[in-house]
């Protein structure tokens, strides 16, 4: 279909039942890593300490932190603080403060299968502006999930998210989005 300008995935995006179960196992560990971060994250800690938690917990449970050394990325997790959109690099000199919001983006390889998720944390007393962006972002995620239907269009997901973001005074960074998971870190489809 290249003559019509359609984009054909470079590899099969459909998974077998066995592959889906392996992806779910990886995702369960990925969620457990985020839960471990939630137990320890606090005002006064560095983002490098978050990286240490992610690395140690992942390795202790048989996984591999997918970001570590991926295309030169130097850490095991992405920590995006306040206005940083994504893929922030943990650093011992970045100390969490009262009022910060931080997105912790964890990606795990378990038995050769990749999973990827992030969680937003609010530290101490955050501003009304920060509360709003966290709330609207969560609403956007939920609307996107509600728009995801078997044999539906990916554009419906993007439309639901983009519409709600714009209605609340925000925009969506078009160069960054969701992606498939499984046998590779970033698989089709790109959402």
Report each predicted region and the residues it spans:
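Active-site neighborhoods and metal-handling regions in enzymes and metal-associated proteins
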Residues: 1-191
